[in-house]
Amino acid sequence: MEPITRVTGTGVPLKRSNVDTDQIVPSQFLKRVTKTGFEDALFFQWRKDPAFFVNQPAYEGATVLVAGPDFGTGSSREHAVWALRDYGFRAVLSPRFGDIFRGNSGKQGLLTGIVTEDDVERLWAAMDAEPGLDLTVDLVERIATAPGLTVPFEIDEYTRWRLLEGLDDIALTLRDEDAITTFEHRRASWRPRTLPARPAALEN
């Protein structure tokens, strides 16, 4: 997972509230067995609207999504985060997030910042006035900026640290690799343990 300190790019105003994970990526796409390639599934039902942002040239290559309250509610599905990430988004700002979605985002390298509803309206107004406007989301300073506009956002310290360091669950575990190895060597030999992978298995 790549570390995140600052995200700068085209901002998208998603003027919808209560966007659940099924709207972000419908269930029929959950049958895929890879963790990438979900950009075509993002907001699949809404793509049929010619006015929706994915069909607007001004928002091509967007990296910052500014959504209404209660974004990412509903069932837990990492695919929602993968779809946003694969499309190109690196940060999402909203007054409220679904707790599970927010947790999944931090583990998958997607910054989710909590901003007030008034500040969301201010960001939307700026993007409406200039479609394709660049926004900067600064994780170090915890502020989002556009020309002439600065708004603060909240993010818990643990998730902020993981994003700044670029630590997914595997990388986080490997930080303690020496301690894990020491524990395994001291553990009684009669206890269950994971056997080393056979060379033939590694070749397949």
UniProtKB/Swiss-Prot annotation:
Q: Which InterPro entries match?
A: 3-IsopropMal_deHydase_ssu, Aconitase/3IPM_dehydase_swvl, AconitaseA/IPMdHydase_ssu_swvl, IPMI_Swivel, LeuD
**Gene3D superfamilies given in the database record:** Aconitase, domain 4 (3.20.19.10)
User: Which Pfam families does this entry report, sorted A to Z?
Assistant: Aconitase_C
Q: Which residues form a coiled coil?
A: none
> What GO biological process, any one, is recorded here?
L-leucine biosynthetic process
- Indicate the family of this protein: Belongs to the LeuD family. LeuD type 1 subfamily.
How does it associate, per the subunit comment? Heterodimer of LeuC and LeuD.
Name of the protein in its database record: 3-isopropylmalate dehydratase small subunit
Report which gene this protein is encoded by.
leuD
